[in-house]
Amino acid sequence: MGKFALNLNAELTGVKNLAPKDEESFYYAFKVQCSGCREIHDNAIEISRSETHSIPGSKGEANLIWTCKNCRKTCSFVIEGPFSPYNDSQETKKVLVLECRGCELVEFIPQGEWIANGAESNTLFDEIVLEDDWYDYDENASSEVSITNLEWSISKA
């Protein structure tokens, strides 16, 4: 069993509280490495806290049960706690913790829609895509806002 932290470091200009748009139904995408055969799989897995599955041979549940296509080892993933909104521009911060059994997280793939608030105006920006740098204009604060230099990392929690 291993607990992994998803960490974020980004430059926020004029925005705060960066988080998934709808955390309950949001799908986090990761590349994984099987702890049995050590294969890093090409296809990403997607995990949502809204899904629960029974763990085979156990009384427990997980957000995702996945089987390695090479060695057939069964792996389980549990999202622990809520996403912690990112506010600390240019500071690495743990934003999510996952418990993984049978495999390890090796890369986060940002996808889906994210939200943030204007730092001065509290304007809601609710269609942020983080596949690249993001820029917009906060009309209430009369200033440009942006999220740039995103660096996602995974560490032991």
From Swiss-Prot:
- Report residues binding Zn(2+): C34, C37, C68, C71
Q: What happens when the gene is disrupted?
A: No obvious growth defects. No increased sensitivity to oxidative stress caused by exposure to hydrogen peroxide (in vitro).
Q: Which Pfam families match?
A: CXXC_Zn-b_euk (PF05907)
What are the UniProt keywords, alphabetically? Answer: Metal-binding, Zinc
Q: Which Gene Ontology molecular function entries are recorded, alphabetically?
A: zinc ion binding
Disulfide bridges in this chain: none
| InterPro entries tied to this protein | CXXC_Zn-binding_euk
Q: Name one GO cellular component term.
A: cytosol
Record comment regarding domains: Requires a bound zinc ion for normal folding and solubility.
The UniProt entry's sequence similarity note says:
Belongs to the UPF0587 family.
> By what name is this protein known?
UPF0587 protein C2D10.03c
**What organism does this protein naturally occur in?**
Schizosaccharomyces pombe (strain 972 / ATCC 24843)
